[in-house]
Amino acid sequence: MLTATMHGPIVSLDALAGGGTHEGNNTSATRARSSLHESVRCGAAGKVDKALEHGLEAYREEDAPVELRLEAAKLCIDWYAALGSYGQCRKLAAQAARLGERYLERCHPLILMMRNSEAYWLAILGQHDMAIRKFSALLADMKHCPGLDPEISIAIRNNSAMPWKHTGKWKKAARVYRELLSEMEGQREEADMTLLTVRDNLAEVLSADRCYD
């Protein structure tokens, strides 16, 4: 079974049955995976409240593999977002990042995605100074993460411009988007959605700054 959330690439839930740094036990892993399957099923049916309920069951399964619990956190954050509970999104992302750091390497993709999510929601909630500090620390740590999935790196860097954009620091935001485009153009199809998103973001801040390329 596959999941895709706002935080990163598609992940196979079945692949997380028991591996990883914190393996957990088979019974807890089975319960967590069952809850995650139900969460995805309910979400696809538009039953967001039930999807969140099942996702939280998986996240709170303390003896399950930590990777599985972090995948559950990713889903729950999406369900909280769908319900407009942005404060809960930030809170859960911060909790999940701390949970992951107890068992996994600091550069583990799931931890980076949770830290990215926390900073993202701080920006959404208007806590821009804190978001800037969180993104700055995250970007610095990313430099020590060889082999990081490019999609995760791009998502984090793209999001890091949000607090600059939200506080009217158009040139700083534009610099982030330009650097991304310089790496992506020529490497991706013109119809690539990530490329188009970054272009749109750059156009938005240039327009706001009344500066046109």
Each model region followed by its residue ranges:
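Amphipathic alpha-helical segments of tetratricopeptide repeats
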Residues: L56-R60, A97-R102, A137-H144, E179-G186
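TPR-adjacent "capping" and linker segments in tetratricopeptide-repeat scaffold/adaptor proteins
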Residues: L16-S34
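Alpha-helical segment of the N-proximal tetratricopeptide repeat
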Residues: T30-R60, A81-Y86
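Helix N-cap/loop-to-helix boundary motif
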Residues: N26-A29, D63-L70, L104-L112, P146-I154, ...
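Conserved alpha-helical positions within TPR/SEL1-like repeat arrays
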Residues: L36-A44, L70-A82, P109-I124, E151-H166, ...
